[in-house]
UniProtKB/Swiss-Prot annotation:
Chief location category: cytoplasm
Source organism: Cereibacter sphaeroides (strain ATCC 17023 / DSM 158 / JCM 6121 / CCUG 31486 / LMG 2827 / NBRC 12203 / NCIMB 8253 / ATH 2.4.1.) (Rhodobacter sphaeroides)
PANTHER family (alphabetical): RIBOSOME MATURATION FACTOR RIMP
Protein name as it appears in the record: Ribosome maturation factor RimP
Compartment annotation: Cytoplasm
Length: 204
């Protein structure tokens, strides 16, 4: 079974290099993308297994990953390394994410049309085998839970809600790295993507 952590061949190669480094530090790789542009950017999202990664930890990951990439040297041209948290409205990139975030709202996009549509919005209802379960509207005041094979997914992301913010607050408090001011800012800019912890870019 594939996942959405690394999509392209070069992304998967880079993930093979950095995943052991990140996991060896006690974190998890959530997503990796090598972005094109005038200067290429390697974007890495990482988190604690129980959530709540902070800026200093992103900095530690950046230093360790940078050293590993300097040894392997898989990117020929100059690039910028960015390490951040997944943010509150985080991407869902692994099958287990849909189980962990059961009960929260999400948007899912599939690679092919399913019953005439590619986009689904609803409440996550866990997993069943290799399927992601999501409860969606089926007409006025009517809901149905459908199963989407994980391999069909092109993109998936949590929707920013008060319930989700409350859960992130709980994770922050549990980790001992709680800064209430961060969440004041998030509530003011609700609907915009917000990274909770981001390490300043490192150029290579």
């Amino acid at each position: 079974m594939s996942d959405l952590v690394a999509k392209t061949a070069i992304d998967r190669r880079l993930a093979d290099i950095v995943t052991p480094v990140i996991e060896g530090m006690g974190f998890e790789l959530v997503r990796l993308r090598l972005m094109s542009g005038k200067t290429r950017t390697l974007q890495i999202m990482a988190d604690r297994p129980d959530g709540g990664i902070v800026v200093d930890e992103c900095a530690e990951i950046s230093t360790a990953v940078s050293a590993a990439l300097d040894v392997e040297d898989p990117i020929e041209e100059n690039y910028t390394l960015e390490v951040s948290s997944p943010g509150i409205d985080r991407p869902l990139t692994r099958l287990k994410d849909f189980e962990v975030w059961t009960g929260y709202e999400a948007r899912i996009e599939t690679t092919e049309l399913i019953d005439g549509r590619r986009r689904f919005k609803g409440e996550l209802a866990g997993t069943e085998g290799d399927e992601v379960l999501i409860t969606i509207e089926d007409g006025r005041d009517s809901y149905v839970t459908i199963g989407l094979k994980f391999d069909w997914l092109a993109d998936a992301k949590l929707i920013l809600t008060e319930e989700l913010i409350a859960e992130m607050l709980r994770q922050k408090k549990a980790s001992g790295n709680f800064d209430e001011s961060q969440f004041d800012e998030i509530e003011e800019s609700e609907g915009e993507e917000a990274d909770e912890a981001e390490q300043p870019p490192t150029k290579h």
